[in-house]
């Protein structure tokens, strides 16, 4: 049986499963779910084997909110001996396909993490054997070298069990298990800074940073205190207006790049139409935040927005779907072209991060 394996944050398997099942049904592909609760793994077992690769070709991973990474299985669970595991894996895999990279992966729980050292040690002889068999290309260390290639995934359930599969380099995360490993900057006043750092890395292509994430831009941070998100803007050389009734970190104020206005983020409106970035991590009802973000963009108060929508305890997938639809409806009402993506990022917890921008002129922009 062919399955699609999806990685997500532990505790969000139901949301991840509901989403892939819904998106597959939209493409007339069906199957049933197997959820590995609190392991961050979802198995979507397809009724038709050909639908695994077909769905991966049709559905962009970036359109899935809760899935960090995914792959299509090419083997069932393989039992590994205590000796010569490499030979067992290469025999099960065969040599019909060629892959541009290898990902050694495991569940995102304590049992899975205990396998990380084992996987690192095994990856070296496994790569060598796969190259020798011409299953892994000689480069075989970076999927960016072959964006049209396939990635080989080895999901270790234990030291004695593995599932093999593939993803498409152009439609999968470049990170093992979809997890970027970011270092917390000691100069930041809050760990929330990693959320925005990851968001920029995830949503904005690196070859567009010089145009969209560059020094000299004006930015607004709603709900800014103590300055975790402001820090990411400042370190990129932007001039920031920080809006929050709380105090900002003195280290940020001393840069000369931050103006702090003590007021409600829902009431602030910029006097000039020269703001490029709006960022927002307010602990507020997601419906209110979604409405506010669409208003800022439609009125031309900013060019791009990066914001978090807090998730409820129950009905999380439905709630975030409704909030995104609110934004889409507002844009559609004014007949504008737009870009809107949401992702439950690694450094997010009970929230999802959303990126939005208009691709046509802001219809409600005031004439200067």
Curated annotation (Swiss-Prot):
Keyword tags = Cytoplasm, Methyltransferase, rRNA processing, S-adenosyl-L-methionine, Transferase
Q: Which cysteines are joined by disulfide bonds?
A: none
What Gene Ontology terms describe what this protein does at the molecular function level?
S-adenosylmethionine-dependent methyltransferase activity
Q: What is this protein called?
A: Ribosomal RNA large subunit methyltransferase M
Per UniProt, the enzyme's principal EC class comes to: transferase
Which terms in the GO cellular component ontology are assigned? Answer: cytoplasm
**Principal location:** cytoplasm
- Assembly and interactions? Monomer.
Q: Which SUPFAM superfamilies match?
A: S-adenosyl-L-methionine-dependent methyltransferases (SSF53335)
Give the Enzyme Commission number: 2.1.1.186
What InterPro entries does UniProt report for this protein, alphabetically?
Answer: RlmM_FDX, RlmM_THUMP-like, RNA_MeTrfase_FtsJ_dom, rRNA_MeTrfase_M, SAM-dependent_MTases_sf
Indicate where this protein resides in the cell: Cytoplasm
- Note the Gene3D superfamilies from the entry: 3.30.2300.20, 3.30.70.2810, Vaccinia Virus protein VP39
Residue numbers binding S-adenosyl-L-methionine: 192, 225-228, 244, 264, 281
The UniProt family comment states: Belongs to the class I-like SAM-binding methyltransferase superfamily. RNA methyltransferase RlmE family. RlmM subfamily.
Q: Where is the active site?
A: 310
Name of one Pfam family that matches: RLMM_N
Q: In the UniProt record, what gene is named as encoding this protein?
A: rlmM
Q: What does this protein do?
A: Catalyzes the 2'-O-methylation at nucleotide C2498 in 23S rRNA.
Which reactions fall under this protein's catalytic activity?
A: cytidine(2498) in 23S rRNA + S-adenosyl-L-methionine = 2'-O-methylcytidine(2498) in 23S rRNA + S-adenosyl-L-homocysteine + H(+)
GO annotation terms (biological process): methylation; rRNA processing
């Amino acid at each position: 049986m062919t399955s699609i394996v999806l990685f997500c944050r532990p505790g969000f398997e139901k949301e991840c499963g509901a989403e892939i099942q819904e998106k597959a049904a939209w493409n007339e592909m069906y199957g049933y779910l197997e959820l590995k609760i609190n392991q961050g793994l979802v198995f979507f077992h397809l009724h038709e084997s050909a639908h695994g690769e077909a769905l991966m070709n049709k559905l962009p991973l970036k359109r899935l909110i809760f899935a960090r990474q995914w792959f299509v299985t090419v083997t069932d669970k393989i039992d590994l001996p205590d000796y010569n595991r490499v030979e067992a894996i290469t025999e099960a895999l065969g040599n019909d396909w060629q892959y541009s990279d290898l990902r050694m992966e495991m569940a995102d729980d304590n049992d899975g993490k205990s396998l990380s050292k084992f996987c690192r040690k095994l990856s070296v002889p496994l790569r060598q054997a796969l190259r020798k068999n011409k299953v892994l290309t000689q480069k075989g260390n970076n999927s960016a070298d072959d964006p049209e290639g396939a990635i080989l995934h080895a999901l270790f359930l234990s030291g004695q069990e593995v599932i093999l599969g593939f993803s498409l380099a152009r439609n999968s995360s470049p990170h093992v298990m979809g997890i970027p490993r970011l270092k917390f900057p000691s100069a930041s006043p809050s760990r929330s800074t990693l959320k925005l750092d990851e968001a920029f890395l995830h949503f904005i292509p690196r070859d567009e940073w010089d145009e969209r994430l560059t020094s000299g831009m004006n930015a607004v941070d709603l709900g800014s205190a103590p300055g975790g998100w402001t820090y990411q803007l400042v370190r990129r050389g932007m001039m920031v207006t920080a809006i929050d009734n709380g105090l900002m970190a003195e280290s940020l104020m001393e840069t000369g790049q931050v103006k702090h206005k003590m007021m409600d983020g829902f009431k602030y409106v910029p006097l000039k139409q020269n703001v490029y970035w709006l960022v927002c991590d307010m602990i507020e009802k997601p419906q209110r935040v979604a409405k506010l973000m669409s208003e800022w963009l439609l009125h031309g108060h900013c060019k791009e927005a990066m914001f978090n929508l807090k998730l409820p305890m129950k009905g999380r997938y439905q709630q975030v779907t409704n909030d995104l639809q609110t934004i889409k409806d507002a844009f559609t009402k004014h007949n504008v072209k737009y870009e809107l993506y949401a992702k439950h990022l690694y450094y997010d917890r009970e929230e999802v991060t959303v990126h939005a921008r208009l691709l046509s002129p802001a219809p409600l922009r005031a004439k200067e």
